[in-house]
Amino acid sequence: MKPDESPQYWDSISRTFTKDAHHSLWRSHSDQINMSLLEDWLGSRQVTNLLKTDLFDEAVSLGLYPLLSEHAGGVYGIDLAAESADEAKKQFPELEAVCADVRKLPFSDNQFDLIVSNSTLDHFQSKKEIDVGFQELFRVLGEGGELLISLDNLQNPIVGLRNLLPYRLLNRLKLVPYFVGKTFGRRGFAAALEKAGFEVLETKAIMHCPRVFAVAVSGILQRRASEKSQRRFLAFLQQFEFFGRLPTRFFTGYFVAIRARKPADPQSKKP
């Protein structure tokens, strides 16, 4: 395990974001983007057991737990960082928070009816590790269950350029706050899920605002602007999601989101 993938590293990132309130306005926008997607895909669905594959959102902001808990009898969450799992549990006592690696899940086969994974598996050094994560998600998801998953979008030119440059340089220039790893474009993402046995049902591109600009302005407004001005800025950022309806959406979106299903007869989908 590389230093940037270690639990200790992600513990330090969790501590930084938990203590730094300057990130909260941007985190609110990020949460809203993810909640809008999930509201669309979940509808009125109710499940027994739901798994969320990291707890960073719930450790540093409200995250997705309030929405997910409306749709599931039990919500489980994992995180490689014990600090994130602990902070999320403090905020949401009914959450079943577990310190674990998505590549080696401590759960039984077919345990979950639904899995939500927002930008968890795009922090690894290799695509092979992402494939291992997909295989584990397939294992613990019940037959007919759905996986709602997003990754950094390699088709976005900014993301593509970022992934060509050394992480140490980007971090030193404060362009990325934590390690970002390998990822896919839309077609490669879908192909990798299908290789793991999933049936891809729907693909979307999300988060279309100019991210570097938006993060920088969010930090300034968080420190200096009134709550009313901050709300207006969040509404302004939300307008960029219009680009998700255009043919160019997979070039402007920073994330690719896929709704996939584990077939009732999963062996029929395995290569």
Language model feature labels by segment:
Residues V180-G197, T203:
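Short alpha-helix
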Residues H29, N171-G188:
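Acceptor-substrate binding/catalytic loop of class I
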Residues D131-E146:
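A short glycine-rich, Lys/Arg-flanked "PGG" loop and its adjoining helix->strand segment in the class I
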Residues E202-P271:
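A C-terminal cap/extension of S-adenosyl-L-methionine-dependent methyltransferases
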